């Protein structure tokens, strides 16, 4: 299997048309980590362990006015043994285990795929910004030299690493500006350390000690009494020339709203199969659909010669919600026809469940306006290396030529958004969503950062809302356990918790989804106790902790205020910097960003900094009140 721009597999071979067909089943379980892998690929600066005929033999470290050269061989020894060369002893504090891990990272790729991918990127405005950043980190190089080095390296093998880039560099000496490298490191890891900082606060501040008792005769996490049947259809939208495969899960005794499941980018309708069967066993009809322009099949078909702009067409931001509305129209007709499925579809009361990009679909149908204009402003302001994988994905929508687009479908009565990609897709217009909404966030999500894609959107929602936080879970923890054997599940770049260790996440997903959906039925009061913080917390174990809230406490709102002030491009909030104290916090943190070492090594320092600042903020606010 060879479609790997960032993930790792134990098998490597040239990608051909026959290989695509042979690997499509394995690919069907992968997800948007192509973006995460791509960002990591760029940070690794290179390719191919095979040395070129005129490879760089020395690496010069520059820190301000200081310079120190070291043989590449000495750096190789350091990465193998961990022993710091004598000439690098003054820089030992920078050569942390995490730095060693990054420099040692080896990425398996297919040059046939990556070369046109990078060529397309480098010719774009984002690519020009990226090359400028890399040129600053490698003084004495030009953007053209960097592109040529990538090209040379790509023709020498199918493994990427930092040392590989050095071996492909045509001059004998390569200079590395440590300050610029640190900036790149901070940009690349920004969402990771933000998640690391916010997770302990979420776990602590959302914790409850006691709660109301839940009914002893009902367990929403266990299967219901209904036998589940499944039917597969392929619907044809002739107006838009789209074939939409759907799986329908149903039982003899049907009640409640219709449930529609929308998958994420590069996934398919099977990704939440366990959840669909569970809900159907309790008498709900569930329809899971494929979005033909952004599912795994579309990705496989465009894999050979893929350009960055082709991986996710901007039109998918329009087609996805229209796919669901088209589906509901067809199900209304099917609901009236005589047969096994007659009366099975309550299309006037629909709960849409989305995962990742599918959550965008769900929220758009619930009334959030797609705002390409606001999205363009964000994507133009953020440097390529600052983007999370989810940001790369959402910025594909910036190509749409509209100011705003509305896809609200009045039949949608609820939304469940697992690990949603939201960010700046809706600008400030997420407040237009008035239907009950459940957002599920994972603290170790390497794809969708907690703050900008879940916490900020949660605060914007104005209707009935719930936030479920899974500390220790990852982007794909909520998906079917069969996905743990996928390429992304085995990735060494985007860590995923998907096997048996993620079972508490899946059990809770079944319970909370059923309890939430039942709020639209006469059994609402019976299931209400299962929407309590205490019940959700009861699923916690040594590896995962779960929290539920309908409103963020003031302590977390203050923490987020600091974040918004120091990251104005992430999301617009009202003028919260009226207080001079908050302005001081902004300046203090901005300075701290410049002096702290890369995020994985400074989490504790940043946490202490934030705790101190927020304690002072609380005291000063008390004085003002």
Sequence positions of predicted segments:
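Mature extracellular/secreted ectodomains of secretory-pathway proteins
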Residues: 66-71, 75-212
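N-terminal cap/lid segment of alpha/beta-hydrolase-fold proteins
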Residues: 204-254
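Alpha/beta-hydrolase active-site loop
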Residues: 309-343, 382
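Gly/Ala-rich beta-loop-alpha elbow adjacent to hydrolase catalytic centers
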Residues: 354-358, 362
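Short beta-strand/loop motif that positions the catalytic acidic residue
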Residues: 433, 439-441
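Short alpha-helix in the alpha/beta-hydrolase fold that links the catalytic acid
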Residues: 435, 449-458
């Amino acid at each position: 299997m060879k479609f790997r721009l960032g993930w790792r597999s134990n098998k490597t071979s040239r990608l051909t048309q026959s290989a695509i067909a042979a690997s499509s089943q394995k690919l069907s379980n992968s997800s948007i980590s192509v973006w995460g892998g791509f960002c990591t690929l760029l940070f690794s600066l290179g390719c191919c362990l095979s040395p070129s005929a005129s490879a760089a033999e020395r690496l010069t470290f520059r820190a301000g006015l200081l310079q120190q050269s070291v043989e590449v061989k000495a750096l190789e020894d350091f990465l193998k043994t961990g022993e710091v060369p004598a000439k690098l002893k003054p820089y030992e504090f920078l050569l942390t285990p995490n730095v060693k891990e990054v420099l040692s990272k080896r990425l398996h790729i297919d040059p046939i795929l990556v070369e046109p991918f990078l060529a397309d990127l480098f010719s774009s405005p984002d690519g020009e910004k990226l090359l400028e950043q890399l040129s600053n980190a490698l003084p004495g190089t030009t953007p053209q030299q960097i592109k040529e080095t990538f090209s040379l390296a790509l023709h020498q093998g199918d493994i990427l690493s930092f040392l590989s880039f050095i071996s492909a560099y045509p001059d004998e000496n390569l200079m590395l500006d440590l300050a610029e490298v640190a900036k790149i490191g901070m940009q690349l890891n920004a969402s990771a350390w933000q998640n690391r900082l916010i997770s302990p606060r979420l776990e602590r501040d959302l914790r409850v000690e006691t709660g109301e008792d839940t009914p002893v005769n009902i367990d929403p996490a266990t299967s219901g009494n209904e036998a589940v049947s499944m039917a597969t259809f392929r619907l044809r939208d002739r107006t838009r020339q789209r074939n939409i495969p759907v799986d329908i899960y149903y039982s003899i005794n049907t009640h409640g709203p219709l449930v529609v499941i929308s998958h994420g980018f590069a996934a398919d309708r099977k990704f939440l199969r366990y959840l669909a069967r569970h809900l159907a066993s309790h008498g709900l009809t569930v329809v899971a659909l494929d979005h033909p322009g952004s599912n795994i099949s579309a990705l496989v078909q465009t894999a050979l010669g893929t350009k960055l702009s082709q991986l996710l067409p901007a039109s998918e931001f329009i087609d996805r919600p229209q796919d669901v509305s088209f589906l509901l129209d067809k199900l209304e007709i099917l609901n009236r026809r005589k047969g096994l499925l007659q009366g099975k579809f309550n299309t006037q009361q629909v709960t849409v469940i989305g995962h990742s990009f599918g959550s965008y679909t769900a929220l758009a149908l619930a009334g959030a306006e797609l705002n390409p204009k606001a999205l363009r402003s964000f994507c133009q302001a953020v440097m390529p290396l600052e983007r999370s994988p989810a940001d790369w994905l959402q910025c594909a929508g910036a190509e749409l030529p509209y100011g705003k687009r509305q896809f609200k479908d009045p039949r949608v009565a609820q939304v469940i958004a697992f690990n949603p990609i939201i960010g700046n897709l809706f600008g400030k217009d997420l407040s237009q969503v008035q239907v009950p909404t459940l957002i599920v966030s994972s603290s170790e999500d390497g794809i969708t950062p907690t703050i900008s894609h879940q916490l900020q959107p949660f605060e914007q929602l104005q209707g009935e809302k719930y936030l479920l936080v899974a500390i220790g879970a990852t982007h794909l923890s909520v998906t079917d356990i069969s996905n743990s054997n996928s390429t992304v599940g085995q990735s060494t770049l985007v860590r995923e918790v998907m096997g048996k260790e993620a079972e508490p996440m899946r059990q809770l997903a079944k319970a909370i989804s059923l309890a939430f959906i039942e709020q639209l039925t006469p059994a609402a009061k019976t299931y209400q106790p299962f929407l309590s913080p205490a019940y959700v917390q009861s699923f916690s174990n040594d590896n995962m902790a779960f929290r539920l809230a309908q409103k963020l406490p003031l302590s977390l709102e203050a923490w987020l205020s600091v974040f918004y002030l120091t990251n104005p491009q992430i999301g617009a909030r009202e003028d919260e910097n009226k207080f001079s104290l908050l302005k001081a916090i902004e300046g203090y943190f901005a300075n701290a960003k410049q002096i702290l070492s890369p995020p994985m090594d400074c989490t504790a320092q940043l946490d202490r900094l934030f705790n101190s600042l927020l304690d002072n903020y609380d005291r000063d606010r008390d004085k003002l009140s």
